[in-house]
A protein has these predicted regions:
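Amphipathic alpha-helical interaction surfaces in cytosolic regulatory modules
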Residues: 26-102
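Acidic phosphotransfer microenvironment of two-component signaling modules
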Residues: 30, 109-110
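A short, charged, amphipathic alpha-helix used as a generic interaction element across diverse proteins
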Residues: 111-119
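Actinobacteria-biased recognition of intrinsically disordered, low-complexity terminal regions
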Residues: 1-4, 42, 118-120
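Short acidic-hydrophobic, aromatic-tinged amphipathic segments that line or gate anion-handling sites
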Residues: 101-109
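STAS-typified acidic loop motif
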Residues: 2-37, 53
Length: 120
């Protein structure tokens, strides 16, 4: 993984959580996308991408999240984000409409609760 970003994963039942730390841009977005997709299985009903420790997200990163959400929707899976507020990432999420394309939560427990309460 690029020195710009680090991705750590953990599992909560059948829900993978990917914590992205650092900067996401065109130089590392393919690698990050491949890692995110590798976390999904046919058993997964959802995935959470935690951007709380992400310091930069360019248009390539935004596009990755939109694309991943669409891919998951076609498989009857849901993508949710965790975004610290206030943060530069929260502003980018609002400006680009990511918050209308997928659920965005302030904390991981909030995101997990939402996905478990509404598995559809």
């Amino acid at each position: 993984m690029s020195t710009l970003a680090r991705l750590e994963d953990e599992w909560h039942d059948e829900i993978p959580v990917a914590r992205v730390q650092g900067e996401v841009d065109a130089s590392n977005v393919k690698e990050i996308g491949d890692r995110l997709r590798s976390l999904l299985s046919n058993r997964s009903v959802a995935m959470i991408v935690d951007l709380s420790a992400t310091t930069y997200l360019d248009s390539a990163g935004i596009n990755l999240l939109f694309t991943l959400a669409e891919e998951m929707r076609s498989r009857q899976q849901r993508l949710a984000l965790v975004v610290a507020d206030p943060s530069p990432i929260a502003r980018m999420v609002a400006l680009t409409g990511l918050d209308r394309a997928m659920p965005v939560h302030r904390t991981l427990p909030e995101a997990l609760g939402d996905l478990r309460d509404d598995p559809a």
